[in-house]
């Protein structure tokens, strides 16, 4: 069986699934210290440390047998583990990430997405056109 690696992206859901599994592992081994702490509580720091300690061995297997190694995503995981509790703080962190140029960066980043969407719409229109004209005998009979 060929192993496929898909380390390019990691979703928040992947991290939360891994956190649940680590917490269940701690419960199974009767290591119950701060297991019930909420992410916003200061007691959750022990869970964060446990996550960081076991990150090198972390693998998430998806249902189509792809797997992701989480050790490649340390920076994103650190960012997700430091949740902001206020909208103002979240906004300030977002602005500082782009050095105060959030508008320009957001515009630049969205351009390829719009191009992808245009290409996808054009490809879908071509497929519909081919389906609609497939039964025609000649080019003159096409009405699309």
From Swiss-Prot:
Coiled coil: none annotated. Keywords: Transcription, Transcription regulation. One of its GO terms (biological process) is viral life cycle. It comes from the Viruses. InterPro entries: Baculo_LEF-11 (IPR009429). The keyword Metal-binding does not apply. The keyword Zinc does not apply. Belongs to the baculoviridae LEF-11 family. Involved in late/very late gene activation. This is Late expression factor 11. It comes from Spodoptera litura multicapsid nucleopolyhedrovirus (SpltMNPV).
